[in-house]
């Protein structure tokens, strides 16, 4: 009993032999040789694009640089490295400090190598001040040294008594609560 796949393959080869007059010899390892010249003698050159052994168009290598290397050179040439690194710190704050700390803190801005951070409570601000050295080490490992050299950590903002866009100067301190 023969394999149905082998039978189908032989039928396809027989049909190709009927149409083309020849089929490649599968017993030889010389798959890279040129097909025989036509019976008329001189072989006409075919027009079209050259293709590789798999039939795909050959790559034309011009020595072009990759997009990433071109962007990196341009970033260095324009001096944007520190700005991009600062943006990375702001957008990846949770990755730098962990989910628990990031849940209670927020990066406000980066100015003159200083990272300004606001915390939900004074307790979180105190804890972050204790961890300041470790946070700066992680930032230096991820984005490089001398990008951020100092953390400015603030607690929550006190509530304001002002309401609305306009403000009249107050009358000074009063005995409000008592």
From Swiss-Prot:
InterPro entries: DciA-like, UPF0232_actinobac
Source species, domain of life: Bacteria
Region (Disordered) residue spans: 16-55
HAMAP family: UPF0232 (MF_00630)
Family: Belongs to the UPF0232 family.
Protein name per UniProt: UPF0232 protein Cgl0005/cg0006
Organism of provenance: Corynebacterium glutamicum (strain ATCC 13032 / DSM 20300 / JCM 1318 / BCRC 11384 / CCUG 27702 / LMG 3730 / NBRC 12168 / NCIMB 10025 / NRRL B-2784 / 534)
């Amino acid at each position: 009993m023969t394999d149905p796949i082998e039978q189908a393959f032989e039928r396809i080869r027989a049909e190709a032999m009927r149409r083309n007059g020849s089929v490649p010899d599968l017993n030889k390892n010389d798959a890279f040789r040129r097909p025989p010249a036509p019976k008329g003698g001189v072989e006409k050159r075919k027009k079209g694009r050259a293709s590789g052994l798999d039939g795909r168009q050959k790559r034309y290598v011009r020595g072009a640089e990759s997009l990433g290397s071109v962007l990196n050179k341009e970033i260095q040439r324009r001096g944007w490295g520190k700005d991009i690194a600062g943006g990375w710190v702001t957008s990846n704050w949770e990755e730098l400090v962990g989910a628990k700390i990031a849940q209670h803190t927020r990066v406000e801005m980066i100015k003159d190598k200083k990272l300004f951070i606001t915390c939900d409570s004074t307790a979180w601000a105190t804890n972050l001040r204790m961890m300041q050295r470790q946070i700066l080490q992680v930032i230096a490992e991820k984005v490089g040294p001398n990008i951020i050299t100092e953390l400015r950590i603030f607690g929550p903002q006190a509530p304001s008594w002002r309401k609305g866009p306009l403000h009249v100067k107050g009358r000074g301190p009063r005995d409000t609560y008592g």
